[in-house]
Swiss-Prot record:
Organism (species): Neoponera goeldii (Ponerine ant)
Tissue spec: Expressed by the venom gland.
Function: Has activity against some Gram-positive bacteria and S.cerevisiae. Has a non-hemolytic activity.
Gene Ontology biological process: defense response to bacterium; defense response to fungus; killing of cells of another organism
Family statement drawn from the similarity comment of this UniProt entry: Belongs to the ponericin-G family.
Name the record gives this protein: U1-poneritoxin-Ng3e
Domain of life (superkingdom): Eukaryota
Keywords annotated in UniProt: Antibiotic, Antimicrobial, Fungicide, Secreted
Subcellular location: Secreted
InterPro entries registered for this protein in UniProt: Poneritoxin (IPR010002)
Any one annotated GO CC term: extracellular region
Organism taxonomic ancestry: Eukaryota, Metazoa, Ecdysozoa, Arthropoda, Hexapoda
Length: 30
């Protein structure tokens, strides 16, 4: 479900760092 995806994404972002988050946000806004 969506909650599971959020948990996975959250853990992944913590490992990969804020750089990935910025890239994702940039991609989402285009």
């Amino acid at each position: 479900g969506l909650k599971d995806w959020v948990k996975i994404a959250g853990g992944w972002l913590k490992k990969k760092g804020p750089g990935i988050l910025k890239a994702a946000m940039a991609a989402a806004t285009q």
